[in-house]
Each structure stands twice: as C-alpha cells, then as structure tokens.
C-alpha cells in the first residue's frame, strides 16, 4: 500500500451512526482548510513585501514550531501510520489537527513550494484518530478501531476539500488496500461532501486554478429551449415580472393559441 499500512477488518454496523458525526466534522475541517488557504494568501498580499521576505518569515515560523512540534513538519506520510496503530491522547490529536491546518495553510499561502494533498490526508487521519480517542474515552465505542476511523476521516477530508466523493473513496481504498471498509468510508465521505456543499465552499483545486489564472472555470453559454406551461402549475396566471427566474434567464417569446406574444412584464402565463 502507498501509505505503508492496510486494514483488513471492517467496522461493526453498530458504529455506523457514529460515522455521521465524523462526516460532519470532516466536512467542517475541509471547509476550514480551504478558507484558511485563501485567508493566508490575502494576508501575505496585504503585507506588500518581497517574495524573499515572505519565504524568510515562513521559514522562521516553521523552524520555531519545529523545535517543539516535529509532528507538524513535513508531508506527514509516516505520521499517518503512527496515528493508525499507536495510541495518542485526545488533546495531542486535537492539537495535531489544528496545528496541521494552520501550518499547512500558512506555508501554502506564503507562496512556498509544497503540495496540499498529503497534508490533507494527515489532517484527516489526525481527525479520525481524535474522534476515535474521544468516543472511546467516553465509553461510546471500544478502543479497537483507530485504523478504521483514520481511513474514514481521510476520505471525508478529501471529499470535503476536493468535492469528489467517489474519487476520495477510491483513493483511500487503493492507497491502503482496505476494501473491507468501503461502506464506512463511503458514509463519512458522502456526509462530509454534503456538509461542504451546504456551506457552498468551492473545490479547492478549482479555486486555486482560478486564483492562478485570474479566470473562472465556469463559462456562460447561451442556450435556447422551449417548454409548455402545465395547467396545474403554481405560476399559472402569474405576471412575468413576478416570476422568480434564475439570474441571466430571459423569456424571448410566448406562443398561445397558435400566435406569438411579446413577453412584456405584465403578460400572464396561461
């Protein structure tokens, strides 16, 4: 496996309701991660200093943090395996989640070279281990399913940030060769995806591409179509000016009893 570990045992069905909460948490983490990246980008743009000075500030910050918190440094591929098979305290895991989000977004926002895919996996793994440790300390679950929670949370984090739930599931399954957990990962991934959709956070890679090119990846395309007004429609006998049409929508012609009517604002649909 690409991440160096595999989980062959699945999660009991009794724990599946708990995964809904994990999915909500991962959706929030994904949205926070995306927004923090652009918050730090705006911060460094506001500083109006040279790129060299920005990198110096980033290096000094990372160096100071690294003296005390080595777990937050680097990509974190070794950390994922440690989180899955070693026991850690709730406070430490929560600190890793928040610290990794802040440090990764800070470095990326400064313009320093580095990716965000592997850090997203580490954030997800840390959040999954945090959820398992918290729930087991409260006596809600048995303390034997850390790897399963790590897998589920990684899928949720990718789905929330990238907005590709199916791809997120496949990536986690293939990188860990843990196909026995496909249903558990699917639940967390879909819930996290829905949370990010409800919060209207665009996919991180689409947003980064738009920021780099200065162009939106969505193009306005002119489309014509015809439709009939059902007799039982709620908007029958409603004036055109009172219709709640989507932005950019224009009614160009109305055909009634074989004749065409100019679509003025006071014309009623029949």
Predicted features and spans:
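Detector for Asparagine
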Residues: 77, 181, 217-220, 244, ...
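Proline-rich low-complexity regions
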Residues: 70, 119, 165, 230, ...
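Membrane-cytosol interface motif
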Residues: 211-227
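Short alpha-helix boundary/capping motifs
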Residues: 200, 219-220, 268-269
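Short flexible coil/turn linkers enriched for glycine and charged/polar residues
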Residues: 111, 164, 220-221, 234, ...
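Cytosolic Rossmann-like ligand/nucleotide-binding regulatory domains
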Residues: 231, 235-270
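Alpha-helical transmembrane segments and immediately membrane-proximal extracytoplasmic
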Residues: 1-216
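Structured core elements
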Residues: 21, 170-172, 226-228, 250-253
């Amino acid at each position: 496996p690409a991440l160096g570990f595999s989980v062959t045992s699945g999660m009991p069905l009794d724990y599946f309701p708990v995964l809904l909460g994990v999915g909500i948490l991962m959706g929030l983490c994904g949205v926070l991660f995306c927004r923090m990246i652009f918050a730090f980008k705006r911060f460094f743009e506001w500083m109006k200093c040279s790129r060299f000075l920005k990198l110096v500030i980033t290096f000094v910050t990372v160096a100071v943090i690294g003296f005390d918190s080595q777990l937050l440094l680097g990509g974190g591929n070794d950390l994922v395996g440690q989180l899955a098979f070693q026991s850690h305290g709730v406070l430490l895991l929560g600190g890793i989640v928040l610290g990794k989000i802040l440090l990764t977004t800070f470095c990326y926002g400064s313009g320093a070279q580095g990716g965000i895919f592997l850090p997203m996996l580490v954030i997800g793994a840390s959040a999954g281990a945090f959820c398992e440790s918290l729930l087991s300390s409260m006596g809600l679950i048995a303390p034997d399913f850390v790897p399963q929670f790590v897998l589920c949370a990684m899928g949720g984090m990718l789905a929330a940030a990238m907005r590709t739930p199916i791809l997120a599931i496949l990536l986690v399954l293939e990188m860990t060769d843990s196909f026995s957990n496909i249903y558990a990962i699917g639940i967390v991934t879909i819930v996290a995806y829905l949370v990010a959709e409800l919060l209207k956070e665009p996919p991180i890679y689409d947003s980064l591409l738009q920021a780099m090119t200065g162009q939106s990846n969505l193009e306005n395309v002119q489309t014509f179509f015809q439709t009939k007004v059902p007799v039982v429609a709620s908007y029958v006998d409603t004036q055109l000016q009172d219709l709640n049409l989507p932005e950019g929508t224009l009614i160009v012609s109305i055909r009634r009893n074989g004749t065409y009517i100019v679509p003025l604002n006071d014309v009623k649909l029949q």
